[in-house]
Amino acid sequence: MFGFLKKVADYTRDAADAANYLIQGLAVTFDHLRRRPITVQYPYEKLIPSERYRGRIHYEFDKCIACEVCVRVCPINLPVVDWVMNKETKKKELRNYSIDFGVCIFCGNCVEYCPTNCLSMTEEYELAAYDRHSLNYDNVALGRLPTSVTTDPSVQPLRELAYLPKGVMDPHDVPANQPRAGQLPAEVLKSLSLQQDSLQGDEGESLQDAPDQDQPKG
């Protein structure tokens, strides 16, 4: 008799624990239902990086003076600067410049300390390749302008997930139905057109009021 009651008590305790665990799991699920998604349907949806995003490095060959400051400030001495000394002008002549993005940590030190601003960080982040050797960009590849996600009609650009309202540090604190901070390119163009229309309307009203002021009073 006591053995049967013990089994019933153990079964009841296990059932209560299972129900408790189930409720805890459902609580987490329902809590995430009220949060905004943190993923996008890549590659059909792409994020618009922020202005200070550190993407692929853009290089301008004509501005480079082969000073090798970028090599000295790089934590891993990554940039390869190939130059020769011109005996007539006694100045360095740049032959080739390359950066291996398979090793680069995108710290931005080379961009920060470049004296001629020939290096700049772009918003391009799609650098995946089948061969790691193809990630070694020479001065020709580095000189290409970055591609924009907003020019492809098959891709829907999205706001950057890091754009949060003022004073908010955790993206989960923003309700799912609240729009993100920042604007899409179409919204920026629309706001600019509205501003231009309002300015033109103000100019038209000022021109109409000007002749009335010049007329003599009867």
Curated annotation (Swiss-Prot):
Residues that bind [4Fe-4S] cluster 1: C64, C67, C70, C114
UniProt xrefs under Pfam families: Fer4_7 (PF12838)
Entry's EC annotation: 7.1.1.-
Keyword set includes Ubl conjugation: no
Recorded GO MF terms: 4 iron, 4 sulfur cluster binding; iron ion binding; NADH dehydrogenase (ubiquinone) activity; quinone binding
Keyword vocabulary terms for this entry: 4Fe-4S, Iron, Iron-sulfur, Membrane, Metal-binding, NAD, NADP, Plastoquinone, Quinone, Repeat, Thylakoid, Translocase
Keyword Nucleus: no
GO annotations of cellular component type: plasma membrane-derived thylakoid membrane
Similarity annotation: Belongs to the complex I 23 kDa subunit family.
Described function: NDH-1 shuttles electrons from an unknown electron donor, via FMN and iron-sulfur (Fe-S) centers, to quinones in the respiratory and/or the photosynthetic chain. The immediate electron acceptor for the enzyme in this species is believed to be plastoquinone. Couples the redox reaction to proton translocation, and thus conserves the redox energy in a proton gradient.
NCBIfam families in the cross-refs: ndhI (TIGR00403), NuoI (TIGR01971), PRK05888.1-3 (NF004537)
HAMAP family: NDH1_NuoI
The name this protein goes by in its record: NAD(P)H-quinone oxidoreductase subunit I
Organism: Prochlorococcus marinus (strain MIT 9303)
